[in-house]
């Protein structure tokens, strides 16, 4: 074991935009994506709402219909990676949690079908699936902008012997602790396209509401690119897979690559190509073909 000096490396954007319905999350995400630049893709679970903004930016869209299982989101993320997009907007990740076929609904189904209504046991099955969804976002080679619907969180208190419901603020409709996954979380103020950072590792956003614009994306990109060069871990992993001498060797190299870099489409393609090569029947020489005849 050896400790080394901490260095901030170049990174990809991991941004969450939260806000109530109609606050402009999709619009804001597209503005920021424009500032980052490159090919933009949108996973749209909001019934075509992203396409309403086709006039303001050039982007491709995948309209994702129910069921909103974690696996369908992972598949969509991998499809965007394989198509070579630079920025992916997931609009919105709330559906993976509380939408039709999302985690909450899956827990109820599994609890009733297998555990006599015991949701604790059902969560043991769903939590790894939800974790795989988050890992697909966090380990992606693309810049990720995720939107999440927020709602007013309330609590019941007692004052002078009387029960009273008090507002605690806005909370994203996703699993608790979601904010820890992202570099920055911007909470959109309903009145206009302004946002307040509820979490910010970049130090770019103060405590006051700031307008969301194309410049927001450019500023974030400058910060992301100002770090030191990252070590290329993908190339040696792909080379190890492509040069595997046996199927067992291939499996070990593939599992090591997934553990390090996640289930990326390039890794999967390299594994499948090498597997076909290793399992293909050997080519017959001319004398062998004559003998076989």
Would you name each region that the model predicts?
Residues 1-12, 16-19, 23-25, 34, ...:
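Interfaces that engage single-stranded nucleic acids at replication/repair/recombination sites
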Residues 12-19, 55-65, 114-122, 159-160:
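Short, basic, glycine/proline-bearing loop/turn elements
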Residues 15, 22, 50, 79, ...:
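Intein modules and their embedded homing endonuclease domains
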Residues 20, 127-217:
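Phosphate-binding/switch region of NTP-binding enzymes
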Residues 28:
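Hydrophobic positions on the alpha1 helix immediately C-terminal to the Walker A/P-loop
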Residues 35, 46-50, 67, 93-96, ...:
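Conserved nucleotide-binding/hydrolysis micro-motifs of P-loop NTPases
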Residues 39-87, 115-116:
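Nucleotide-state-sensitive switch-loop elements of NTP-binding domains
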Residues 90-126:
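Conserved P-loop NTPase nucleotide-binding/switch module
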